[in-house]
Amino acid sequence: MTHKYAPLLLILGITSATAASTTYNVDPDHTHPSFEVDHFGGVSIWRGTFKKTSGIVQIDTAAKTGTVDVVIDTATIDFAHDKLNEHVSSPEMLDVAKYPTAEYKGKFVEFVDASPKTISGDLTLHGVTKPVTLTINSFKCFQNPMLKKQVCGADASGTFNRADFGVNYGQQYGFKQDVLLRIQVEGIKVTAASP
């Protein structure tokens, strides 16, 4: 026999499941996407970072689901080398005037207990979107005593081929095209009182 309250219970169940998802605003002061790139086919490794990032993370540890959306200001690239910053920002490489942002959007696809371990998503860089999988190397949430809010932090990493995004400068000189991307991120829980 069909229960007359079944539709209501279903709606309440969906609402409850949705409410279990927690939203975090990416903290730009504690989020530092960084990367490693090859120089002349193994002679050395150049490391850089991006200084400005924004985004939102939603996670439901009980349901083991969640999403990530991180936007990077490509004009803030920093190798601690002014001339190199200028060159990488130029039309010959990232062309930050034409493509001022890079974005990673993905979903948590693997959890161990309550901790996410893998993100399957898409990276948009230089106007090109390609799939990139990130491994979450560490994840922790705590009640920040200064902010008086819950903060979650993670270190995620993955590799991609920059030539796939149309950024293949140096390939003719033997530069390897693989890039190691690391995203060190902290997110502040959004509450009713949050701005």
Positions of predicted regions on the chain:
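Bacterial N-terminal signal peptides that target proteins for export
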Residues: 1-7
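A generic signature of intrinsically disordered, low-complexity regions enriched in glycine/proline
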Residues: 7-9, 64
